[in-house]
C-alpha cells in the first residue's frame, strides 16, 4: 500500500467525520499514530527519513499533549497564559483551509514527529503555571516487555549496529530526534520551542541542551523522587542511595560538573533512563560522573576504604609494642619515676595499667580508649594528691593556731611570774636592808632573816646648795647650820629658831615665815629624792612629828639610806 496515499486518505476521512469540520493537526497525527503502531511492518525499509529535521506549522503559543496506551503524559504548557490541558489542545487548532493545505504535504517526517515525539521525549511533566501535581510515575511499568540491559552493553551494541537506533525509536525505545540542531527559544521560558525546552531523554546520546527550566519546590521534589533507585521486575533487592557507594544526589541550584546553569535542575542518568514515558533500563555497573566527588571515603560499616594500610600499621604496632614498653620503662627509670623496669610491668596502679594497655593496643580505637583511661586515671590521682595536700595544709594551719594560743597563754603566765618575782624581790630588799638597823648588833629583837652583803659607806662630794643641809661634818658648812656656843643649850632648835636672832643668815629671811627654815629645807630634800610618793609622804609626816634633833637626825638617816639604795 502506498504510504502517502494512506496518509491522505485517512486525513480526508478524519476531516469528514469531524462534527464541526475542523480538527487540530495533533488529533490527525494521533489517529495516524494509532493506525501505524498496529502495523509497523508496512513502513518501508528505508528509515533515513527518521533523522530529518522536524518542521511543523504550529504557532508560537501552542502546546502538545498526547497520551499513549498505559504510559505517562508529556505536556509543555505555555507561560503566556496558564490554561489547562484541554484549553491548550484547543488553542493549537488551525483553520480548515490550512488543515486541507497541509494535509496534502504531510510526509514521513510528520508521522515520525507524532510517533517519536510521544515515545522518545523525556520531559519533566510539571505544570509550572498552575503548580499542580507533577504526574511523574514513581515506578514506571515495563509494559512493552523489552529486556533491560546496561549502558555499556547498549553502547557497544549501537556502535556495532548504527541502524539500530532508528529501529529502537520506531519501536518505542527512548531516542533523541536526530538530524538537526536544537531550535532556539522563541518565547519566554522556552514555551514556544515545540516541546524542546525540556531536557533530552536519550540514554544513548551524551548531548545536553542548555535550556532553562524555572525551578519550583514541586519540581525539586519530583527530581528527587525520580533520582531514587527503583526495584527491578526480577525481584532483586532494591538498591538505595545509602547502600550504593558510587552515587550521590546532586545538590539543587548549584553548578554541577556538566556546567548546567543554576536555574536548571541537574539531569542525572536515572532521569534519562527511568523517564515517565520510556521503559526503565536498569544500570548495574554504574560509575560516578566525571568531575563529581565520590560520595564517601568510608562505607556503611564505618571503616576507611584502605584496609591494607590499617592492617599493615596494626601488624607493625603489634610488632613494636614490646620494644615500646621497654623504651617507656627505661625512660621512666631514668627520670626517677619508678625504681626499675620490672616495677612498670608489674605495677597495679591505674595509670601504669592503662599505659601498658595503650602500648599494647592493636588498633587506633583501642589505643584511643586506653589513652583516655590513662588521662582520666592520672587526673584522678592528681586530684587525690591535691586533696591530701589540702588536708595536710589544714592540719598545719590548725597546729599553728594552737601554737599561737599556747604562746599567748605562756606569755601571760610569764608576765604574772615576773610581777610576782618583782614583788618578792622588793619584799626581800626591805627585810635585808631595814632589819637589824640598830646600834647593838647583838640584840635579838629585829634580827634580819636574810644576811646580805654589807654596804660600804662612801663619802660623796656634795655641791653647795643653800636649800640643802647635811648633819655630817663638812669642810664648808652652810649658813643655815651654824655652830655656836649656844646650840647645845637649845633643846628644840627647830621650834626655837622662829625667834629673830642676829645669828640668822640672810638666806633664812628669804624663806616663808609660816614654816621654820630648817623644816622647810628638809621637806624639800625629801620631796626631791627618787623615792616613791607614799614613802615621801610618810617621811614628811614622821619629820613633822619629831620633837628633838635626834629624832630628826634618825629620820634623815633613813631617807639617805633609801636614796643610796636606789641610786646604787
Curated annotation (Swiss-Prot):
Compartments it resides in: Host cytoplasm
Pfam families: Paramyxo_P
InterPro entries reported in the protein's UniProt record: Paramyxo_PProtein_C, PProtein_oligomer_dom1, RNA_pol_Pprot-P_XD_paramyxovir
Biased segments, Basic and acidic residues type: 7-20, 83-101, 150-168
Major subcellular site: host cell
Annotated spans, Disordered: 1-23, 38-320, 496-516
Skewed-composition ranges (Polar residues): 50-59, 191-206
Effect ascribed to mutating residue 250 to A: Prevents S-249 phosphorylation. No effect on P protein functions
Region described as Multimerization: spans on this chain: 344-411
Post-translational modification: Phosphorylated by PKC/PRKCZ, and other unknown kinases. Phosphorylation is necessary for viral transcription and replication. The N-terminus contains the majority of phosphorylated sites. Ser-249 is the major site of phosphorylation, but is not necessary for most functions.
Gene Ontology biological process terms in this record: DNA-templated transcription; negative stranded viral RNA replication
CDD domains referenced in this protein's UniProt entry, alphabetically: MEV_P-protein-C_like (cd21031)
GO cellular component: host cell cytoplasm; protein-containing complex
Effect of residue 447 to A: Complete loss of phosphorylation
Phosphoserine modification, residue list: 68, 125, 192, 249, 257, 260, 447, 449
Protein task: Essential cofactor of the RNA polymerase L that plays a central role in the transcription and replication by forming the polymerase complex with RNA polymerase L and recruiting L to the genomic N-RNA template for RNA synthesis. Also plays a central role in the encapsidation of nascent RNA chains by forming the encapsidation complex with the nucleocapsid protein N (N-P complex). Acts as a chaperone for newly synthesized free N protein, so-called N0, allowing encapsidation of nascent RNA chains during replication.
Note: The P/V/C gene has two overlapping open reading frames. One encodes the P/V/W proteins and the other the C/Y proteins.
Subunit annotation: Homotetramer. Interacts (via multimerization domain) with polymerase L; this interaction forms the polymerase complex. Interacts (via N-terminus) with N0; this interaction allows P to chaperon N0 before encapsidation and form the N-P complex. Interacts (via C-terminus) with N-RNA template; this interaction positions the polymerase on the template.
Protein name (database record): Phosphoprotein
Species this protein is from: Sendai virus (strain Harris) (SeV)
Taxonomic classification: Viruses, Riboviria, Orthornavirae, Negarnaviricota, Haploviricotina
Originating gene: P/V/C
Amino acid at each position: 500500500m502506498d504510504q502517502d496515499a494512506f496518509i491522505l486518505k485517512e486525513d480526508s476521512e478524519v476531516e469528514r467525520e469531524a462534527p464541526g469540520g475542523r480538527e487540530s493537526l495533533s488529533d490527525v497525527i494521533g489517529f495516524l499514530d494509532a493506525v501505524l503502531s498496529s502495523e509497523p511492518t508496512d513502513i518501508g525499509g528505508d528509515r533515513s527519513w527518521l533523522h530529518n529535521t522536524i518542521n511543523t506549522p504550529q504557532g508560537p503559543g501552542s502546546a502538545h499533549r498526547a497520551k499513549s496506551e498505559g504510559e505517562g503524559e508529556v505536556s509543555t504548557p505555555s507561560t503566556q497564559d496558564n490554561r489547562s490541558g484541554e484549553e491548550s489542545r484547543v488553542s493549537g487548532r488551525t483553520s480548515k483551509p490550512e488543515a486541507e493545505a497541509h494535509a496534502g504535504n504531510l510526509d514521513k517526517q510528520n508521522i515520525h514527529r507524532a510517533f517519536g515525539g510521544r515515545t522518545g521525549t523525556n520531559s519533566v511533566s510539571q505544570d509550572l503555571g498552575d503548580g499542580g501535581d507533577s504526574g511523574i510515575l514513581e515506578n514506571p511499568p515495563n509494559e512493552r516487555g523489552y529486556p533491560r540491559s546496561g549502558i555499556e552493553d547498549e553502547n557497544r551494541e549501537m556502535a556495532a549496529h548504527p541502524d539500530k537506533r532508528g529501529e529502537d525509536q520506531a519501536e518505542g525505545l527512548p531516542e533523541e530526534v536526530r538530524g538537526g540542531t536544537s531550535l532556539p527559544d522563541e518565547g519566554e521560558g522556552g514555551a514556544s520551542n515545540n516541546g524542546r525546552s525540556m531536557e533530552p531523554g536519550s540514554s544513548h546520546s551524551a548531548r545536553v541542551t542548555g535550556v532553562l527550566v524555572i525551578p519550583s519546590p514541586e519540581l525539586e521534589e519530583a527530581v528527587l523522587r525520580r533520582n531514587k533507585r527503583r526495584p527491578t521486575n526480577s525481584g532483586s533487592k532494591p538498591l538505595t542511595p545509602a547502600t550504593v557507594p558510587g552515587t550521590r544526589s546532586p545538590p539543587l541550584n548549584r553548578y554541577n560538573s556538566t556546567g548546567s546553569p543554576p536555574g536548571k535542575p541537574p539531569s542525572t542518568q536515572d532521569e534519562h533512563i527511568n523517564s515517565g514515558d520510556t521503559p526503565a533500563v536498569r544500570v548495574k555497573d554504574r560509575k560516578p560522573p566525571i568531575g563529581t566527588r565520590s560520595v564517601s571515603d568510608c562505607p556503611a560499616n564505618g571503616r576507611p576504604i584502605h584496609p591494607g594500610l590499617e592492617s599493615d600499621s596494626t601488624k607493625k604496632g603489634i610488632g613494636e609494642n614490646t620494644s615500646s614498653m621497654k623504651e617507656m620503662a627505661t625512660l621512666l627509670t631514668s627520670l626517677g619515676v619508678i625504681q626499675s623496669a620490672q616495677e612498670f610491668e608489674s605495677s597495679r596502679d591505674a595509670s601504669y595499667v592503662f599505659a601498658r594497655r595503650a602500648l599494647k593496643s592493636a588498633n587506633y580505637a583501642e589505643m584511643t580508649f586506653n589513652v583516655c583511661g590513662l588521662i582520666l586515671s592520672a587526673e584522678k590521682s592528681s586530684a587525690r594528691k591535691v586533696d591530701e595536700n589540702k588536708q595536710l595544709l589544714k592540719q598545719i594551719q590548725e597546729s599553728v593556731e594552737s601554737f599561737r594560743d599556747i604562746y599567748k597563754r605562756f606569755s601571760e603566765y610569764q608576765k604574772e611570774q615576773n610581777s610576782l618575782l618583782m614583788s618578792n624581790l622588793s619584799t626581800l630588799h626591805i627585810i635585808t636592808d631595814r632589819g637589824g638597823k640598830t646600834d647593838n648588833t647583838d640584840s635579838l629583837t629585829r634580827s634580819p632573816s636574810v644576811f646580805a652583803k654589807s654596804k660600804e659607806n662612801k663619802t660623796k662630794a656634795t655641791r653647795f646648795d643653800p636649800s640643802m643641809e647635811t648633819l655630817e661634818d663638812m669642810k664648808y658648812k652652810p649658813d643655815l647650820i651654824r655652830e655656836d656656843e649656844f646650840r647645845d643649850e637649845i633643846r628644840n632648835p627647830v621650834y626655837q629658831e622662829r625667834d629673830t636672832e642676829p645669828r640668822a643668815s640672810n638666806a633664812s629671811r628669804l624663806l616663808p615665815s609660816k614654816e621654820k627654815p630648817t623644816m622647810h629645807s628638809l621637806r624639800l630634800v625629801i620631796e626631791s629624792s627618787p623615792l616613791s610618793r607614799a614613802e615621801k609622804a610618810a617621811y614628811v609626816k614622821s619629820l613633822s612629828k619629831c620633837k628633838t634633833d635626834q629624832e630628826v637626825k634618825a629620820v634623815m638617816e633613813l631617807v639617805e639610806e633609801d636614796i643610796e639604795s636606789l641610786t646604787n
